[in-house]
A protein has these predicted regions:
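A structural signal for the principal folded core domain
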Residues: 1-560
Length: 560
């Protein structure tokens, strides 16, 4: 018993020592201050001059402290959004590092930003009239995660949308102040794009976005492409027409009347860019495998090998609006019929990708397959190459391993010339006339015929490709890309790349339709995922337009 009281006494003494020590530290710190109080004023210790009343100083300091704390919380919200850090992940970080604000402060600030932004840019959910899901058997799934697939399926029948007018009213003022837009020449060049992601073999995630072409330095950032429409379902004409009803109506109004923002009426030039499938759907046109396959000219599959014919962009949107049946292959009125046809551009990335993918298939480049680890797993995975990797394979692949020396030399010449076209396509200073000439020379080499007659004993020298192997993308590369360069010289074809659009769609699907990575795991269905995604889009606009946020970029240091 005596030992017990002795231990309690020691603890009490220790507590008093700590308490007294803390008080002594406070006294010493106060004595060392350079300012002290006198007659309700803060006085400078050296000059004795009054600075400001105590109550004003306290309020000012408190206000500044609150502002700094709020800015820090907003910066953390911004960081978690940009890095796609979930609530659960942040909770774990805050548990480890006590200096981080509590998770509830971050969530509360995020909710507050959502409320503020929904007043400015409301989010609307609409019922889709068609919910039929039909993904082609040969289409490759972009996302195969079962949880994401199930979340997407649960959201079928709903679409989310935001008003393009509301978005423009929110962002134009800052763009004008930053010098991106010019109020004295009140014209906005608006580019529209779309993309469909295959989520398993059950559903697609379709997104329609806009970006400001005038904001050149930011065109390749996904967050500078503003989502106006998104829905899980089918990537077809009827579904898009239903989901984009409000968007199409507003585009017609912008084209006809412009948009008044702060007493300035802004006029609009519209452009459209996407992959081949999405473009043809929006144009009400045949697919790439049809006899009449070109959206811009009236060529057909039977005429692909006629090198003497110079196919030009002869179709017009005016004629399509008057009677689309005049042009073979057009089956419905174009959805974006307010955009001139010479402002419809194919994504330069897909032009290149489909050309060299065909060659890689032909030369039968092999990749390694392996079985995924895991108990009872029957899934197989495989290596895949991105665009630059594929180009490197074709450029450096030893063709002599597959072909005779003479044929290997021809194929190497063909793909070296294609590499030159690839580089010219990405160069804004490329002369369209020179590109057109080089592209036609490349096509002539592509169609190099075989020589010799075995019947009379002549040696057979194999050619390269047949006219039937000219794909729609090759046709566009040779006959229409030069015209696209001429018509859009102000921007350059790189400005119409859809890489950022596809990246954004893939990231959003991977994150917002994985219920365990959002809302603390309480997301119940895909419909709420649609709203969460558009809330995120609104917050991105908030970050871009709020100058008070300070979110420093990380820097990489290289040590040699």
């Amino acid at each position: 018993m005596l030992q017990h009281y002795y231990m309690k006494l020691l603890l009490l003494i220790r507590h008093l020592e700590l308490q007294g020590g803390l008080q002594l530290c406070c006294v010493m710190r106060n004595r060392e201050q350079k300012h002290y109080r006198n007659n309700n004023y803060i006085l400078n210790k050296h000059t004795k001059s009054a600075l400001k009343p105590v109550n004003e100083a306290s309020n000012s300091t408190l206000t500044k402290h609150k502002e700094n704390k709020k800015q820090k919380v907003q910066a953390i919200v911004q960081a978690t959004d940009q890095s796609l850090i979930s609530r659960e992940a942040y909770q774990s970080l805050a548990t480890i590092e006590h200096k981080l604000p509590c998770e509830y402060l971050i969530s509360s600030e995020k909710i507050q930003i959502n409320k503020e932004m929904e007043v400015v840019i409301p989010i609307k959910l609409i019922n889709m009239q068609t919910t039929r899901v039909d993904i082609g058997f040969y289409e490759e799934p972009h996302i195969i995660d079962e949880e994401i697939v199930n979340q997407m399926v649960s959201a079928i029948g709903k679409a989310g949308c935001r008003s393009i007018k509301d978005i423009l009213k929110y962002i134009v003022l800052k763009l004008n102040n930053d010098g991106v837009l010019n109020a004295t020449c009140s014209i906005i060049n608006l580019r529209i794009s779309g993309d469909g992601r295959n989520v398993g073999r059950k559903v697609k995630q379709v997104m329609v976005m806009c970006t400001i072409l005038d904001d050149r330095k930011n065109l390749h950032f996904p967050n500078k492409h503003f989502t106006t429409v998104l829905y899980p379902g089918n990537e077809d004409y009827d579904s898009l027409k239903n989901a984009m009803a409000l968007f199409l109506k507003e585009l017609h109004e912008l084209k006809e009347f412009g948009l008044e923002i702060n007493d300035i009426i802004w006029q609009f030039n519209f452009y459209f860019s996407s992959d081949w499938k999405f473009l043809c759907i929006c144009l009400g046109f045949n697919g790439a495998n049809s006899k009449h396959f070109c959206p811009w000219c009236e060529t057909s599959k039977d005429e692909r090998g006629r090198l003497e014919t110079n196919w030009k962009m002869t179709k017009t949107m005016e004629q399509l609006n008057f009677d689309y049946t005049v042009y073979k292959g057009h089956q419905q009125v174009p959805l974006f019929n307010m955009i001139p046809l010479d402002h419809w551009l194919i994504d330069e990335l897909h032009v290149i990708t489909w050309c060299y993918c065909k060659e890689m298939d032909r030369i039968k480049v092999k990749f390694q397959f392996w079985k995924e680890k895991g108990k009872g797993s029957e899934n197989w995975n495989y290596t895949s190459l991105m665009g630059e990797d594929k180009m490197k394979v074709l450029k450096e692949f030893n063709l002599g391993l597959l072909f005779s020396p003479s044929r290997a030399i021809k194929i190497r010449e063909l793909w070296n010339k294609f590499s030159d076209l690839y580089n010219d396509l990405h160069n804004d200073n490329t002369n369209p006339d020179d590109f057109e000439k080089s592209a036609k020379e490349w096509l002539a080499l592509f169609l190099l015929p075989s020589k010799g007659n075995w019947i009379v004993g002549e040696e057979i020298i194999s050619g390269l490709y047949l006219p039937s192997e000219i794909t729609p993308y090759i046709h566009v590369l040779v006959y229409h890309v030069a015209d696209m360069m001429r018509n859009n010289k102000k921007w350059g074809l790189k400005a119409f790349s859809c890489a950022a659009v596809e990246k954004k769609n893939h990231q959003h699907v991977s994150y917002f339709f994985r219920k365990t990575l959002k809302d603390g795991g309480v997301c119940k269905n895909g419909t709420s995922s649609i709203k969460e995604l558009l809330y995120y889009e609104n917050r991105v606009l908030y970050y871009n337009n709020t100058n008070t946020l300070y979110f420093p970029n990380s820097q990489k240091i290289y040590i040699r």
